[in-house]
Regions:
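Short, charged beta-turn/beta-strand-edge "cap" motif at the junction between a beta-strand
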Residues: 211-219
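Sliding clamp-binding short linear motifs
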Residues: 1-5, 10-13, 18-177, 186-198, ...
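Active-site cofactor/co-catalyst pockets and adjacent glycine-rich loops in catalytic enzymes
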Residues: 180
């Protein structure tokens, strides 16, 4: 079944040139431009490209630089964290806590502070960041976020071999589902019989676990009669569980 899926769409990453499409031929992946993500503009994408060679010991240090640059706002940084853009600094769950502490609470950092206060707060933020354990976001929540803001799922989790996200549904004739494989990151099409689809309707953004499937010959109609297409097959869902 995996062979029926094609090239994988990967998430953008800090230090890549994501001003446009980024192709990794070795990994057989392609990343969309940062500007395709909701609330991420060209100025932000350009600035991140310019900063690609900068070295940061902690994520807090990067946030401090962002605080002084008008290309960044809290919402854009939050979205990029959730999409794994800054994964070199840690997991999304951990970085979200650092980001929250940076803007709220007793050790928040602001360009309005005097330099001595900024240095004191940054030292405290670095210590706070180092004290945190890695923590992720629930898988289903993460994928739904990716669909909403990036337009498609990006997360890959190899152990979830039967888990798929529904990208869109064509309900003409036997419904066709365009699916994203969470285990491989690839997309493909599966068909489902109408009676089964009516009992368990699906729409774009839903997630399902495939319980059974079959490969069957593809048919075409000639003079009003179904005829098999030589050498062509289709994947059919036989049983699934909506999550």
């Amino acid at each position: 079944m995996r062979r029926s899926f094609g090239i994988r769409v990967a998430a953008c990453r800090f230090r890549q040139d994501n001003r446009g499409f980024y192709i990794d031929r070795a990994a057989n992946t392609i990343s969309d431009a940062l500007t395709s993500i909701k609330h991420i503009g060209r100025r932000t994408a350009q600035k991140l490209f310019e900063w690609r060679e900068r070295q940061y010991k902690t994520f807090s240090d990067l946030l401090a630089d962002m605080e002084f640059d008008p290309a960044f706002d809290s919402q854009a940084v939050d979205i990029l964290i959730r999409l794994g853009y800054f994964q070199e600094f840690g997991s999304a769950g951990k970085l979200l806590k650092v980001h929250a502490a940076f803007h709220e609470g007793e050790i928040r950092f602001s360009k309005a502070h005097i330099p001595a206060t900024q240095q004191k707060r940054l030292t405290a933020l670095r210590a706070f960041e180092r004290s945190l354990e890695e923590s992720g976001v629930p898988l289903a929540e993460q994928i739904r976020f990716e669909v909403e803001y990036a337009g498609a799922p990006l997360t890959v989790c190899e152990r979830e071999r039967d888990l798929y996200a529904v990208l869109d549904v064509d309900e003409r004739y036997s419904p066709k589902l365009r699916l994203y494989s969470v285990s491989t990151g690839r997309t493909g099409v599966m068909k489902v019989k109408k009676p089964l689809f009516r009992t368990q309707p699906l729409k774009g953004g839903d997630m399902l676990r495939i319980l059974d499937w079959q490969r069957r010959p593809a048919y075409q109609y000639i003079d009003g009669k179904p005829c098999p297409r030589p050498g062509v097959s289709e994947l059919w869902l036989e049983a699934y569980e909506k999550i």
